[in-house]
């Protein structure tokens, strides 16, 4: 028998189904589960990392429990080693642990060789003295570990490209010559999230040491079709209820607000459960590199709060009717590392790549922004620069200090001014009349951007409801609005006072 076949044989011989309609029966792995195990353990190159991404309710937790028991007292047990499972919440971590305990208690042979410590969420495999711990991001037990096997459950819930808890687990494996990291999860909502980055890297790099099995429905899948369900639910009809799937699909069909949730959790698609202003496919349609040729250019300036992103977006219509977009961003240097973690965005990487500029100190120093803008606009025949008046006074002073004259025009952030600009930008994007070059910082802002409506149906971007920074999209919308002459009078829009938070 191969190594993978021994793992399968152990699970099907010693692991008992602990709950559900098949309770008490020997566990029988579905073909997709066997395929994954064989790919991981019989990989000629050796497997360092394995990813299995499937929709919810496809036997994920049972597979995790079976694999960890194979490493605890089965054919993969290694003398005096440690294995862990990790989840973001205590509840999720407890589910894996409790399922493994139930499997042990249902088999007298396993009961004899596994010591259970419920209070510490710990199992000891007595034959080889292997210790298993169920960890959660809410706990404080990740440091001092050295697991030869780590299984991460529902990593798709991590927002952004980094997570301290997961870092602590993965870096703790460095003491072993052949550690194994297994990730079993439904997909993340966005391309910029950690699991998406791991999956994309596995696909692009073709690293032979990474096994990656992803079951997902096509982007344009019809949510009512069985073939769409089957693409993401390989256990459909066995331990994934087809009747329940049909109910969920019917609900998504009659309730548009539920469709994104269904697509993410049940079709395993990268779809945010919050409806974005611009869909990923539309954004990518406009991803060609922008072209700087002589024309009239319009800018939008979003200064935001002094410790957030400051964004300048310059846009202009080319002879072919397409709008070319050039974004520029600034952020405080002193708090860069902290905000890289809190915002879950690779600001530090973008700074190194020249995509994000920094200013000294803990808040954005507008004098440095002004100096940069003076250099930037030398490449553009700038007609107007739309700005949000709430934070413009210091910016004006810094511009005056170096003798910089800018064609500044006030632009309200309420529904009155933002509404037409949002409509215009959306129309341009939907018709492929934008070239933004997939600038990573602007793309992050686009992914995060959501809109809200007033009673009349007017829309505006809303930072309070966004899933992350949207400053670049606000500036981009303002630049398009400035081009159409959609600017406020000196007094501003009443909506600004009612609907806009005073600080962000």
Swiss-Prot record:
Record has Flavoprotein as a keyword: no
Residue numbers spanned by region ATPase activity: 1-204
Pfam families named among the record's database cross-references: TerL_ATPase (PF03354), TerL_nuclease (PF20441)
Outcome recorded upon mutating residue 60 to A: Almost complete loss of ATPase and DNA packaging activities
Domain notes: The ATPase region is in the N-terminus, whereas the nuclease region is in the C-terminus.
Assembly mode: Homopentamer; forms a ring-like structure through which genomic DNA is translocated into the capsid. Interacts with the terminase small subunit; the active complex is composed of a pentamer ring of terminase large subunits and a nonamer ring of terminase small subunits. Interacts with the portal protein; this interaction allows the packaging of viral DNA.
Protein name: Terminase, large subunit
Primary gene name: 2
